[in-house]
Swiss-Prot record:
Keywords: Acetylation, Fatty acid metabolism, Lipid metabolism, Mitochondrion, NADP, Oxidoreductase, Phosphoprotein, Transit peptide. One of its GO terms (cellular component) is mitochondrion. This is 2,4-dienoyl-CoA reductase [(3E)-enoyl-CoA-producing], mitochondrial. Belongs to the short-chain dehydrogenases/reductases (SDR) family. 2,4-dienoyl-CoA reductase subfamily. It comes from the Eukaryota. The modification Phosphothreonine is found at T69. It comes from Rattus norvegicus (Rat). It catalyses: a (2E,4E)-dienoyl-CoA + NADPH + H(+) = a 4,5-saturated-(3E)-enoyl-CoA + NADP(+); a (2E,4Z)-dienoyl-CoA + NADPH + H(+) = a 4,5-saturated-(3E)-enoyl-CoA + NADP(+); (2E,4E)-hexadienoyl-CoA + NADPH + H(+) = (3E)-hexenoyl-CoA + NADP(+). The keyword Glycoprotein does not apply.
Length: 335
């Protein structure tokens, strides 16, 4: 899961330790809470409703893995509200059915739920056949199923490595190849979208299995963007930065210690929201993006460029300190 697929469910009106200014908004039946400590966040308010015109996906079929919660649920909600017939899949059928019923009642479009463990190629094969049976060949395929946990790499067991790579890399491959074969047979195109993470490109300590697997997912999608365009398929990638969802943060920031640090290194001054990611995802999967293929879109409020700049930490220097520094620089030889 992207180091952080998150906008988190909290049934609170105020936390015991008041974190400063807050924004509350609703998503489905849940209340989401987000800290907005950084003053500049007021310049970057999130838009929480679909940006595409109504019925942008009318008559289209969308298949979303990991569609029962978090980012997957948000993307499914937006696609359904824009007219798509959605089919969601994951291992937990009870959560899937509840989400499908919730979105169906909200949008008026039937959402189907299919239990699927993407680690099992036989189950993936049967799921794709059921998808085609209940809804037809998909026009949109979103590979969102993921798994992650933090651990020093020297503490990793072979099973820990295998658990993550089986879900993220192998699972994405099984779904993509199986659906691709069916689409080629039917002579039908589709838009594929993979949800990865900003550290798929840079790498990251303490999440090495996820970083490695997500990097593989990106290579896979870029390879297929080149190879399967001739069949009417295009492939794009979103690299989310910190988007707080309960599921991801329970494993990646279980103590809540790192959230403030995250916000401090995001130039936009806040975490992202699931709705913002859903807007980007629906655009990339829509006909409005028909000439976007093989793209990797970083969606992180500027976090990656801040972290990669050698001198970006100088933002903490005050005006008075800059006056002193400037005076010292002017006294150096060659100034």
């Amino acid at each position: 899961m992207a180091l952080l697929a998150r906008a988190f469910f909290a049934g609170v009106s105020r936390l015991p330790c008041d974190p400063g200014p807050q924004r509350f908004f609703s998503f489905g039946t849940k209340t989401l809470y987000q800290s907005i400590d950084a003053p500049q966040s007021k310049f970057f308010p999130p838009i929480l409703k679909p940006m595409l015109p109504p019925n942008a996906f009318q008559g289209k079929v969308a298949f979303i893995t990991g569609g029962g919660t978090g980012l997957g649920k948000a993307m499914t909600t937006f696609l359904s509200s824009l007219g798509a017939q959605c089919v969601i899949a994951s291992r937990n059928i009870d959560v899937l059915k509840a989400t499908a019923e919730e979105i169906t009642s909200k949008t008026g479009n039937k959402v189907y739920a299919i239990r699927c463990d993407v680690r099992d190629p036989d189950m993936v094969h049967n799921t794709v056949l059921e998808l085609i049976k209940v809804a037809g060949h998909p026009d949109v395929v979103i590979n969102n199923a993921a798994g992650n946990f933090i651990s020093p790499s020297e503490r990793l067991s072979p099973n820990g490595w295998k658990t993550i790579t089986d879900i993220v890399l192998n699972g994405t491959a099984y779904v993509t190849i199986e659906i691709g074969k069916q689409l080629i047979k039917a002579q039908k195109g589709a838009a594929f979208l993979a949800i990865t993470t900003i550290y798929a490109e840079s790498g990251s300590g303490f999440v090495m299995p996820s970083s490695s697997a997500k990097s593989g997912v990106e290579a896979m999608n870029k390879s297929l963007a080149a190879e399967w365009g001739r069949y009417g398929m295009r492939f794009n990638i979103i690299q989310p930065g910190p988007i707080k969802t309960k599921g991801a943060f329970s494993r990646l920031d279980p103590t809540g210690k790192f959230e403030k640090d995250m916000i401090e290194r995001i130039p936009c001054g806040r975490l992202g929201t699931v709705e913002e990611l859903a807007n980007l995802a629906t655009f990339l999967c829509s006909d409005y993006a028909s000439w976007i293929n093989g793209a990797v879109i970083r969606f992180d409020g500027g976090e990656e460029v801040f972290l990669s700049g050698e001198f970006n930490s100088l933002k903490k220097v005050t005006k008075e300190e800059w006056d002193v520094i400037e005076g010292l620089i002017r006294k150096t030889k060659g100034s």
